[in-house]
């Protein structure tokens, strides 16, 4: 089945919280077969857990991340996404703006694969949305 939604790191992290956002959980359950994560999100998850101090929380998060790996297709950051990212960042810099690099890579992955980016950090992706065909949804704020 074609994946439609690319989940940002803050959405995936929600699943490991003690009290996850009910809207995020409900929409994920409804659409989980259509969801994937980017290789960049996978990198951010691994980085986050690796730098945590040893303890019960780190052990729990590591377990969650391993389950994520089984639950989500990981969409690679490929040459086409790199080209899109380079264009987005280059155009932004021409206008005196800087796009966050990892967010730019995640946005470019979504664009390259014709996917909707699901994030709670909509503001981080506004510049990319204005300069491209990036579609963004915030599952926290579903009416």
Language model segments and positions:
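Generic structural signal for small/hydrophobic residues in well-ordered secondary structure
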Residues: 8-9, 45, 85, 110, ...
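Alpha-helix capping/helix-boundary segments
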Residues: 11, 41, 81, 106, ...
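Residues that scaffold the ATP/ADP-binding catalytic core of kinase and kinase-like folds
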Residues: 14-15, 48, 85, 128
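Short, hinge-like loop/turn segments at secondary-structure boundaries
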Residues: 53-56, 92-93, 134-138
């Amino acid at each position: 089945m074609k994946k439609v939604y690319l989940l940002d790191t803050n959405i995936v992290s929600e699943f490991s919280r003690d009290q996850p956002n009910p809207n995020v959980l409900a929409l994920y359950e409804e659409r989980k077969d259509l969801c994937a994560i980017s290789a960049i999100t996978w990198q951010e998850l691994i980085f986050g857990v690796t730098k945590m101090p040893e303890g019960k929380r780190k052990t729990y998060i590591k377990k969650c991340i391993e389950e994520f790996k089984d639950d989500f297709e990981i969409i690679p950051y490929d040459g086409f996404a790199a080209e899109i990212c380079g264009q987005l960042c280059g155009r932004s810099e021409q206008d005196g703006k800087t796009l966050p690099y990892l967010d730019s890579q995640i946005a470019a992955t979504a664009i390259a694969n014709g996917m909707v980016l699901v994030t709670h950090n909509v503001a981080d992706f506004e510049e990319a949305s204005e300069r491209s065909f990036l579609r963004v949804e915030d599952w926290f704020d579903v009416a």
